[in-house]
Amino acid sequence: MKFLDQAKVYVRSGDGGAGSVSFRREKFIEFGGPDGGDGGRGGDVWLEAVDGLNTLIDYRYQQHFKAKTGVHGMGRNMTGAKGADVTLKVPAGTQVFEEDNETLICDLTVVGQRFLLAKGGNGGFGNQHFKTSTNQAPRRANPGLPGEELNIWLRLKLIADAGLVGLPNAGKSTFLAAVTAAKPKIADYPFTTLHPGLGVARIDAREFVIADIPGLIEGAHEGVGIGDRFLGHVERTRVLLHLVSAQEENPGKAYKTVRAELDAYGNGLIEKVEILALSQVDTLDADARRKKVASLKRAAGRAPMLLSAVTGEGVEAVLRALMTVIAEARAEAAPVVETRWEK
């Protein structure tokens, strides 16, 4: 499935149905009064976070959504039915912005959350409402009120517990494939991963979600390479797993490059808990391994974990380190109650 993390959409709720002009007509009742019913309310436009989605690709092919108009009122005081609603289904982690792409309307972070984007117009009054002492047979009814319309931006920030960061070819996709059922594209050239990928890792009977982010290079925050566009997908993570390839000539410099890009991006990424690992250590002999570890330790101020997704060395230790941070963060997270939401 193709990946799309931003889309512009036009939505319009349904107009209200028109009220009816009608009079009671029955045998032996010569002067039946007005009995025109009210129009039905127009359909609403809802946004709902659903399970099983991790892209906004559907909104590349359809950008206009309109709820149905309410049914018109009828005689015998029959009110028209409400117009059918429209529900836009999006992945959890989707933010909705106004047309300026800056003003946040809502943020759907949990599967099952629903938000009312546009409320349907009210139905018009039938002529029964206009009967007075001086006008016993009003021939007047109201049209329904128009629905609301707006242009919105949908922006997806994937929800994962841990985010993989590092330079291209640091072994992020290989690690993701080794510890989850995900099947990312893996090859020996830069930017093999062009879009974020998700996988579920399991350790000690507990599970967490890992996001593989396309590699960063120096100047990514200025648009170099494929830029820092996808860094938004690690904003919601609880911990970063920073992989530095053992094949780097200068692991310390590689580490500092990625940290500088995280800092330049902002939004608190540089402050997130970071697990540091020297990956692809199976490609080194003992002497080379010591030198690379020393270089990385000098740059980071702490010793890295050693990891090889190919041989399995250090994989369980890294997963346990990630799970420890994630479990603590989950315990501290308090549920947030939003009064604007309807379910």
UniProtKB/Swiss-Prot annotation:
| Record-annotated Obg domain positions | 1-159
GO biological-process terms attached to the record: ribosome biogenesis
Q: Name one Pfam family in it.
A: MMR_HSR1
Residues annotated as binding GTP? 166-173, 191-195, 212-215, 279-282, 308-310
Would you name any one GO CC term? cytoplasm
The answer to whether keyword Ribonucleoprotein applies is no
Q: E.C. number, please?
A: 3.6.5.-
Q: Which UniProt keywords apply?
A: Cytoplasm, GTP-binding, Hydrolase, Magnesium, Metal-binding, Nucleotide-binding
Q: What is its main location?
A: cytoplasm
Span of domain OBG-type G: 160-327
Q: Which family does it belong to?
A: Belongs to the TRAFAC class OBG-HflX-like GTPase superfamily. OBG GTPase family.
This chain's protein is named: GTPase Obg
Species of origin reads Mesorhizobium japonicum (strain LMG 29417 / CECT 9101 / MAFF 303099) (Mesorhizobium loti (strain MAFF 303099))
